[in-house]
């Protein structure tokens, strides 16, 4: 909040506002889940995203930050079958529009705004500190013969996820890899320094698009550090609302928050 705004409040209002900001930030940190498929659907005016975990059997109607881990397969540690996109009617019938998408090509595009390009944090310090990755390091998203490489200066580019038919459903996983050099889906050097890697994207289908969502990947760090990175994007990489909006948001999130899973 700009410093010139606070003097217009009484001391009580300032304390209330700061408290609201702290509460909202803490609550927003819970609106992000690791190891969830993205659940894209239409609310009639734009694409919205939730999350679903087959393993945990849980579904969230609203999620904007998703976490995944490299290294789950020791034989192929730098290639994973995430993120996934799944809006099955088995768990979305209570969503707006019954969880369906408009027919068309579901595409993922690099977010051109704040924290859209590939950022990195080495996991040290008292708080997360993300900055663009070193030149040459990229994350690659692959579907079939199509690839989307995202580096520290990438501000555009898109990848087709799936063709959405009249039923409005999708279940598709991308293959994600991390490395440097090469071209397309092949890196000269597969892998990169341990740490947390993240980028932002938007989704589009049938003429509608989403607000930015964020993908936060763990490479060789603890899940506690991964969670700190996820929470950073949940609280820092979104536009700062006014203090009164934060109060409303805090109450709303408190009413609907779910445990991280």
Give residue spans per PLM region:
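Selective for proline/serine-rich intrinsically disordered segments
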Residues: 1, 5, 100, 237-239
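C-terminal cell-surface anchoring/sorting signal
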Residues: 2-28, 242-261
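Short, threonine-centered small-residue motifs that mark membrane-proximal processing/anchoring sites
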Residues: 17-36, 222-248
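Mature extracellular "passenger" or substrate-interacting domains of secreted, surface-exposed proteins
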Residues: 34-237
């Amino acid at each position: 909040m700009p410093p010139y705004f606070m003097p217009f409040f009484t001391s009580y209002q300032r304390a209330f506002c700061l408290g609201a900001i702290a509460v909202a930030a803490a609550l927003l940190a819970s609106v992000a889940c690791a190891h969830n498929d993205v659940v894209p659907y239409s609310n009639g005016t734009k694409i919205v995203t939730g999350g679903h975990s087959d393993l945990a059997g849980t579904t969230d109607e609203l999620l904007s930050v998703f976490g995944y881990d490299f290294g789950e397969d020791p034989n192929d540690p730098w290639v994973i079958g995430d993120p996934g996109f799944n809006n099955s009617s088995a768990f979305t019938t209570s969503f707006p529009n019954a969880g369906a998408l408009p027919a068309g090509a579901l595409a993922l595009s690099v977010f051109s705004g704040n924290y859209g390009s590939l950022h990195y944090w080495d996991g040290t310090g008292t708080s997360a500190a993300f900055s663009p990755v070193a030149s040459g390091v990229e994350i690659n998203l692959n579907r079939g013969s199509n690839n989307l490489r995202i580096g520290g200066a990438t501000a555009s580019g898109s990848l087709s996820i799936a063709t959405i038919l009249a039923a409005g459903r999708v279940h598709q996983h991308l293959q994600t890899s991390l490395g440097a050099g090469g071209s397309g889906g092949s890196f000269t050097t597969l892998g990169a320094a341990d740490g947390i890697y993240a980028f932002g994207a938007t989704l589009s289908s049938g003429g509608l698009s989403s607000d930015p969502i964020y993908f936060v990947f763990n490479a060789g760090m603890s899940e506690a550090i991964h969670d700190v990175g996820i929470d950073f994007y949940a609280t820092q990489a979104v536009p700062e609302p006014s203090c009164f909006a934060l109060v409303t948001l805090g109450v709303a999130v408190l009413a609907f928050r779910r445990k991280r899973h």
